[in-house]
């Protein structure tokens, strides 16, 4: 029983580390892809629907 708990704890620990590393890698890739021009397009996309809603009064 003790070895089973020990094994499960080890698997949980290794899985947590793996998820953490994957998340850091994903965040780094997103930062590399974000160029100033792309950021401007994203802001415009978010701004356009809100601007239309305010102009139309909905």
Curated annotation (Swiss-Prot):
User: One matching Pfam family, short form?
Assistant: FSAP_sig_propep
Which keywords does this chain's UniProt record carry? Amidation, Amphibian defense peptide, Antibiotic, Antimicrobial, Cleavage on pair of basic residues, Immunity, Innate immunity, Secreted, Signal
Q: Does the keyword Signal apply?
A: yes
- Where is the signal peptide, in residue numbers? 1-22
Compartment list: Secreted
Q: Which InterPro entries match?
A: Frog_antimicrobial_propeptide
Where is it found, in Gene Ontology cellular component terms?
Answer: extracellular region
Q: In which tissues is it expressed?
A: Expressed by the skin glands.
The biological processes this protein is annotated with in GO are: defense response to bacterium; innate immune response
- Does the entry feature the keyword Secreted, yes or no? yes
Region: Disordered; residue ranges are: 25-46
Q: Which residues carry this modification: Leucine amide?
A: 56
Prodomain positions: 23-46
Family statement drawn from the similarity comment of this UniProt entry: Belongs to the frog skin active peptide (FSAP) family. Temporin subfamily.
Q: What does the UniProt function comment say about this protein?
A: Antimicrobial peptide that renders both the outer and inner membrane of bacteria permeable to hydrophobic substances of low molecular mass.
Identification of the protein by name? Temporin-1Th
